[in-house]
Structure formats: structure tokens, C-alpha cells
Amino acid sequence: MQIKLEPRKNFGHKEGCVRCGRKRGLVRRYGIRMCRQCFRETANQIGFRKYS
């Protein structure tokens, strides 16, 4: 008996950070598509504010 293996689906998460290309820790909310490190560095320039 042979089992047929199918390739895993990627679900569209193959794109990395638009700034550095990292694929882990992505912030995709609001269409930002940045890793969390790049988001922390550029959040003020984008228009996000830190409250505390």
C-alpha cells in the first residue's frame, strides 16, 4: 500500500517583510506586511502612536 503525499498549501504567506524580507513575525493588519522589528522602527513615520 502506497500513500500519495500532496504538497502542503502555502495559503499566501510566502511574502516576507517589504522592508527587510524576513518571513517570521509579520504584521499584516491594515495591509502593512512588515516584520515586527521593522514595524517598531517605522511606526512613528507611518502614523502610529505609542500610548504608554
Curated annotation (Swiss-Prot):
Which ranges form a coiled coil?
none
A single GO BP term for this record reads: cytoplasmic translation
Q: Which cofactor does it need?
A: Zn(2+)
- Listed InterPro entries: Ribosomal_uS14, Ribosomal_uS14_arc, Ribosomal_uS14_CS, RIbosomal_uS14_euk_arc, Ribosomal_uS14_sf
Bilayer-spanning residue ranges: none
Q: Which GO terms describe its cellular component?
A: cytosolic small ribosomal subunit
Q: How is the cofactor bound?
A: Binds 1 zinc ion per subunit.
Gene3D superfamilies on file: 30s Ribosomal Protein S14, Chain N
Annotated positions binding Zn(2+) = C17, C20, C35, C38
Report keywords, A-Z: Metal-binding, Ribonucleoprotein, Ribosomal protein, RNA-binding, rRNA-binding, Zinc
Which GO molecular function entries does the Swiss-Prot or TrEMBL record give? rRNA binding; structural constituent of ribosome; zinc ion binding
What is this protein for, i.e. what is its function?
Binds 16S rRNA, required for the assembly of 30S particles.
Q: Which HAMAP family match?
A: Ribosomal_uS14_2_A
User: PANTHER family recorded for this chain?
Assistant: 40S RIBOSOMAL PROTEIN S29 (PTHR12010:SF2)
Quaternary form?
Part of the 30S ribosomal subunit.
Q: Which family does it belong to?
A: Belongs to the universal ribosomal protein uS14 family. Zinc-binding uS14 subfamily.
Name of the protein in its database record = Small ribosomal subunit protein uS14
Organism phylogeny: Archaea, Methanobacteriati, Thermoplasmatota, Thermoplasmata, Thermoplasmatales
